[in-house]
């Protein structure tokens, strides 16, 4: 059924709709948008607020992550009232805030029933802590010291790795923490290969034992064979030698020292003797040296003491011993010196039969005189 006038216009319909038009103002969606955001411009224009600011900030410019715009740009009026932005470590991430038909996720859209990422926030805060850097540097220093000890052990073992470092990174937990280098584990020394330190210690002990052996051979009195006793006895012996040196220096300064060898030599000096001419030859025998002496003395116990001093001639000792043996004289003790001249001191025994045949000591003396090459002459 159509409500039309005679002229064909829909006047009835217009009359029915007129009260509605007078009571409700005519508004379009564009008018509503401009009323909410009066400064909203075209996307092609550089002024105003962009669509991304509305989606991220929820209509409130204070809640945006970016820096606030300059004060010359007036902020739009938000469509709805929003709560202040919580701190970063209390941000709630909701899967419900993701719009499957949109391209932008607003994490501040809802506040309830969220899974908080506190672990990630704590990691970021710890990464910015200065104590974390100190701990990382301490780890690096410990790694370097461990590598030096490993090098020393490898050098002592005579083999092993070349000392290179394995690039193993130890992360500090995020946030740009410094990475340290950890050395490779030290390989144990090869079996059968002696350590350099062990060989050096063996050589040192061998030298010490050799020196102790030399010291033990020099010191005359060693109580025990251990090292402590050897050193103690050596110190005592050195002190004794020092005391002897001091005493000898004192005696040499005072002139009290006497030599027994000088006295023995003075006893051998005699006056000049001239033997008679030899009957076998017309030539005279040369003068006897002032040190020539022939003495024979009988003792009460039956022994005979013989003292002889003359010039040294070839085969003097064998001829003298043969002459004494011919007389039956047996030498018990004899001291002979051939330093410059020939000298002999002897203590002899004689058989009873030979003693009866020998009248006196003069016969023994003449025998010694002839054995010395002085002919048949007698001593004056």
Curated annotation (Swiss-Prot):
GO molecular function, one term: DNA-binding transcription factor activity
InterPro entries according to UniProt: bHLH_dom, HLH_DNA-bd_sf, TF_AMS/ICE1/BHLH6-like
Domain bHLH: 192-241
GO CC terms in record: cytoplasm; nucleus
PROSITE patterns, A to Z: BHLH
Subcellular location: Nucleus; Cytoplasm
Record's keyword annotation contains Cytoplasm: yes
SMART domains: HLH
Residue ranges of the region described as Disordered: 180-202, 270-289
Region (Helix-loop-helix motif): 206-241
Superkingdom of the organism of origin: Eukaryota
GO BP annotation list: regulation of DNA-templated transcription
Cystine pairings recorded for this chain: none
Chain segments carrying region Basic motif: 192-205
Role description: Probable transcription factor.
Protein name: Basic helix-loop-helix protein 004
Gene name as annotated: BHLH004
């Amino acid at each position: 059924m159509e409500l039309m006038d005679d002229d064909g216009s829909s006047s009835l319909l217009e009359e029915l709709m007129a009260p509605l038009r007078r009571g409700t103002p005519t508004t379009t969606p564009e008018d509503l948008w401009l009323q909410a955001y009066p400064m909203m411009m075209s996307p092609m224009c550089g002024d105003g607020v962009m669509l991304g600011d509305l989606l991220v900030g929820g209509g409130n410019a204070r809640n945006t992550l970016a820096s606030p715009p300059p004060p010359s740009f007036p902020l739009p009026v938000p469509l709805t009232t929003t709560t202040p932005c919580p701190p970063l470590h209390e941000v709630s991430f909701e899967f419900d805030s993701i719009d499957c038909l949109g391209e932008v996720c607003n994490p501040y859209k809802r506040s309830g029933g969220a899974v908080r990422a506190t672990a990630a926030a704590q990691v970021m805060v710890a990464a910015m802590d200065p104590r974390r850097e100190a701990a990382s540097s301490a780890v690096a220093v410990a790694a370097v010291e461990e590598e030096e000890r490993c090098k020393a052990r490898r050098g002592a073992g005579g083999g092993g790795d070349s000392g290179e470092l394995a690039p193993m990174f130890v992360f500090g937990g995020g946030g740009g923490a410094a990475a340290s280098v950890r050395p490779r584990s030290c390989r144990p020394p090869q079996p059968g290969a002696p350590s350099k330190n062990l060989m050096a210690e063996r050589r040192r002990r061998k030298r010490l034992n050799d020196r102790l052996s030399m010291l033990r051979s020099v010191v005359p009195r060693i109580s025990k064979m251990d090292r402590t006793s050897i050193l103690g006895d050596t110190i005592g012996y050195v002190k004794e030698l020092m005391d002897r040196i001091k005493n000898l220096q004192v005696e040499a300064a005072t002139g009290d020292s006497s030599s027994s060898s000088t006295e023995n030599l003075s006893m051998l000096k005699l006056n000049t003797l001239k033997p008679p001419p030899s009957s076998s030859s017309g030539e005279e025998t040369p003068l006897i040296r002032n040190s020539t002496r022939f003495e024979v003395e009988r003792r009460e116990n039956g022994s005979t003491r013989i003292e002889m001093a003359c010039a040294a001639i070839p085969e003097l000792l064998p001829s003298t011993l043969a002459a004494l043996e011919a007389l039956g004289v047996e030498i018990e003790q004899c001291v002979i010196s051939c330093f410059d001249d020939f000298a002999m001191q002897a203590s002899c025994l004689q058989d009873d039969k030979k003693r009866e045949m020998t009248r006196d000591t003069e016969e023994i003396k003449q025998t010694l005189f002839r054995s010395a090459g002085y002919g048949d002459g007698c001593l004056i």
